[in-house]
């Protein structure tokens, strides 16, 4: 029998819980013990190192700090970190007035506050065409010997070295260029490393300096060992070794789990700690960058980020150390963020960072709900227990007396957000035997225990089921254990949680860059996990190591490619469809076709990326052009950043629209605009490319010249794209198109995003 708490308004009550849920989580976020310290940590960035000797660099930092604090004792007590390997800077505990005074020192380029950042599989590689068997057919994976010789640096929450994903059976010697080490600390020693895990360090001073109560060994491992689990999953996704017969209580039983570059080496830099689900101090993350650059990593996977930016990211977070890594040939891969489908929520927007959006896989863990008339509804669940025979259902939105109504029943609960006031634990505690969540499509992360029937229905299906049940005086449902559905019938989508472009502070730079699978990835579980729910991870932080693994393969295949060339190869060969040819859509209530602000160039196509034909390259001059365009950098600051007195900001006539990124985005088109790009031929020496234009709706797009002819002496050519508003005479939303250069073998495609802005400060 269907029951309700309020017979005349139960459906409204189901939705009423939404407001309470948001207020509760916003007001209850911070826990005791994480109160900021009275002397905040500030980061002072000084640019490129002026000395090769790190000791001399550190001494110069102490002298700068002493110029404000006066005594050597106060200086040593204040210093948290000296960044002296990959770049020059330091972190120090100071009073705000002292920090402001030090900001005026002539060697200080930028002063940053020490923000707190958050931590943002089996089927993944089959889905992308890299089949998960050690003996499968020829591919990029095998041409690169599965990434052997590459070192992937991971800045995250640590690593559980005993996992089978980090077994070194069959590995060759550690690369000669490696200069890192495995430190000895709390329940971790150099013996925990091997030829797979070749480096492991940790950084906590920045976070502890900002907390009233320091993190201690009762709640965390004060070592590279992973207590949170996130770092272990990220590492295994990027470069995990082959693990046969991987299973999660029957889920994907018999699968082979591996990372993107299964024979690549891993170096873990633990800078994130198990506080409030995962907290990373910017000061600690910078130190991890500093040492990773020095140690000799080939790729950096950094699955961290803050909330949507209220300022340029070159003033906060990871952009500056990432620039130094990229300038030294190390690609930096980071997430777009998990703040959902709202516009301008993307993070890590600097053009030198490879920013990753998340998509779903062609896999669904599905459970059947059967009515007494045999009508069925399909929901998502990881429930592996026995079938629940026909039983009563109750719909509730106000669970104040849930203890009186749930016993022996299945609860149907409507929710429109990721935070739910009614949890499986509460239902179980009060005798309920199942829970059906009805919520908007896209909240696909599976967060329920596998031993309790906890099923997700989207709002449309849930409303249909609710309406159907309400018309019956007596209705029961049956719940079946999950079944895995794989293949073309499961549509691939951009995850609802994946943050969207454009960046509100640099809208002319398209972000995110690329998309990769990031939802419901099956990864290793560390023994400290309380249950099996953490085995299944989702988010852009899981999509990030997918791309990092692919980048490692490309570095082995093309050792001379710059980070910008690698990004270009990924973006220009990406797919606008899933591997089955269906257009990618957006996971969420609007069901729209995905566009460049959802996925950048599209879904990664790693086999095409190894032979892109043409590439859009960039170097430090392009990146300083970007910095200068934001009016943050003077000639003096640019010279300090690059370590070259001859490097200066470009002339005032140079437009940010001409930055050689593999995209064209014009956020404020008022008339005709010319945009230039330069492409480098990395394909057949003698080749001819012709343009194919898909103009955004209502805009005119013309390309000149009409052909690009490459030969031995001409492997780099420029072209101009002329854009005009066409039929548009009002402020528009963004419209999307593309430009493809084709030689009938390669199709080198960049996205075009255009918006008119005839009236300033006018909101549509």
From Swiss-Prot:
Residues 41-116 form the Inhibitor I9 domain. Glycans are attached at residues 76, 216, 245, 374, 674, 711, 747. PROSITE patterns: SUBTILASE, SUBTILASE_HIS, SUBTILASE_SER. GO terms for molecular function: serine-type endopeptidase activity. The active site is at residues 156, 230, 541. Its main location: secreted. InterPro entries: Peptidase_S8/S53_dom, Peptidase_S8/S53_dom_sf, Peptidase_S8_His-AS, Peptidase_S8_Ser-AS, Peptidase_S8_subtilisin-rel, Peptidases_S8_3, S8pro/Inhibitor_I9, S8pro/Inhibitor_I9_sf. Residues 33-120 form a propeptide. GO terms for cellular component: extracellular space. GO terms for biological process: pollen tube growth; proteolysis. Keywords: Autocatalytic cleavage, Glycoprotein, Hydrolase, Protease, Secreted, Serine protease, Signal, Zymogen. Its EC number is 3.4.21.-. CDD domains: PA_subtilisin_like (cd02120), Peptidases_S8_3 (cd04852). Residues 1-32 form the signal peptide. It is found in: Secreted. Residues 124-610 form the Peptidase S8 domain. Belongs to the peptidase S8 family. This is Subtilisin-like protease SBT3.1. The gene is SBT3.1.
């Amino acid at each position: 029998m269907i029951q309700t708490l309020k017979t005349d308004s139960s459906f409204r009550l189901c939705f009423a819980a939404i407001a309470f849920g948001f207020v509760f989580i916003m007001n209850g976020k911070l826990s005791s013990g994480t109160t900021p310290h009275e002397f905040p940590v500030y980061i002072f960035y000084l640019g490129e190192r002026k000395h090769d000797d790190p000791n001399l660099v550190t001494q110069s930092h102490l002298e700068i700090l002493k110029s404000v604090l006066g005594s050597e004792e106060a200086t040593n007590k204040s210093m948290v970190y000296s960044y002296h390997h990959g770049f020059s800077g330091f972190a120090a505990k100071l009073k705000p007035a002292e920090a402001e005074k030090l900001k005026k020192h002539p060697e200080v380029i930028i002063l940053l506050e020490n923000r707190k950042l958050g931590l943002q599989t089996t089927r993944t590689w089959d889905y992308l065409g890299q089949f998960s068997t050690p003996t499968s057919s020829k591919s990029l994976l095998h041409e690169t010997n599965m990434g052997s010789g590459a070192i992937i640096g991971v800045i995250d929450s640590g690593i559980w070295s005993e996992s089978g994903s980090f077994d070194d059976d069959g590995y060759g010697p550690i690369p000669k260029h490696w200069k890192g080490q495995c430190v000895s600390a709390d329940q971790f020693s150099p013996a925990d490393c091997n030829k797979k895990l070749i480096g492991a360090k940790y950084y906590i001073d920045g976070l502890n300096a900002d907390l009233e109560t320091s993190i201690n060994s009762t709640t965390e491992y004060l070592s590279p060992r992973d207590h949170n689990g996130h770092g272990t999953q990220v590492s295994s996704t990027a470069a995990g070794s082959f693990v046969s017969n991987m299973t999660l209580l029957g889920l994907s039983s018999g699968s082979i789990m591996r990372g993107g570059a299964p024979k690549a080496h891993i170096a873990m830099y633990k800078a994130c700690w198990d506080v409030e689900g995962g907290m990373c101090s910017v000061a600690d993350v910078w130190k991890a960058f500093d040492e990773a650059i020095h140690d000799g990593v080939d790729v950096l996977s950094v699955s961290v980020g803050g909330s949507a930016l209220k300022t340029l990211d070159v003033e906060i977070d990871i952009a500056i150390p990432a620039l130094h890594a990229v300038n030294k040939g190390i690609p930096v891969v980071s997430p777009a963020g998990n703040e959902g489908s709202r516009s301008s929520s993307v993070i890590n927007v600097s053009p030198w960072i490879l920013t990753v959006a998340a998509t779903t896989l062609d896999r669904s863990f599905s459970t059947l709900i059967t009515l007494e008339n045999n009508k069925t509804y399909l929901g998502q669940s990881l429930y592996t227990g026995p079938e629940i025979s026909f039983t009563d259902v109750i719909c509730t939105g106000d669970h104040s007396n849930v203890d009186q109504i749930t016993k022996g029943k299945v609860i149907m609960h409507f929710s429109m957000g990721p935070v739910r006031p009614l949890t499986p634990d509460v239902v179980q505690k009060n005798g309920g035997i199942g829970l059906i969540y009805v919520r908007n499509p896209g909240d696909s992360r599976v967060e329920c225990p596998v031993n309790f029937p906890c099923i997700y229905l989207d709002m449309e299906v849930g409303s249909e089921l609710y309406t159907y049940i309400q018309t019956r005086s007596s209705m029961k449902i049956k719940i079946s254990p999950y079944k895995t559905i794989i293949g073309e019938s499961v549509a691939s989508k951009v995850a609802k949680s994946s943050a969207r472009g454009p960046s509100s502070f640099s809208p002319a730079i398209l972000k995110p860059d690329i998309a990769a699978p990031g939802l419901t990835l099956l990864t290793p579980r560390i023994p400290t996990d309380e249950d099996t729910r953490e085995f299944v991870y989702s988010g852009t932080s899981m999509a990030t190591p997918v791309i990092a693994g692919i980048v490692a393969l490309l570095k082995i295949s093309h050792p001379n490619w710059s980070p910008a060339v690698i990004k270009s190869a990924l973006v220009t060969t990406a797919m606008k469809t899933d591997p089955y040819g269906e257009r990618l859509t957006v996971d969420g209530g609007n069901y729209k076709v995905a566009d460049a602000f959802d996925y950048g160039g599209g879904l990664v196509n790693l086999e095409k990326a190894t032979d892109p034909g043409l590439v859009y390259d960039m170097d430090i001059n392009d990146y300083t052009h970007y910095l200068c365009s934001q009016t943050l950098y003077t000639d003096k600051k640019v010279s300090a950043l690059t370590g070259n007195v001859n490097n200066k900001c470009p002339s005032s006539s140079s437009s940010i629209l001409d930055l050689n990124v593999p995209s064209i985005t014009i956020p404020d088109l008022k008339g005709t605009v010319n945009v230039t790009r330069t492409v480098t031929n990395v394909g057949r020496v003698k080749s001819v490319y012709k343009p194919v234009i898909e103009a955004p709706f209502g805009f005119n797009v013309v390309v000149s010249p009409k052909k690009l002819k490459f030969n031995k002496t001409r492997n780099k050519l420029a072209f101009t794209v002329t854009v005009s508003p066409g039929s548009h005479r009002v402020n528009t939303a963004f419209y999307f198109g593309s430009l493809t250069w084709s030689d009938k073998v390669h199709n080198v495609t960049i996205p075009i995003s255009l918006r008119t802005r005839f009236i300033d400060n006018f909101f549509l």
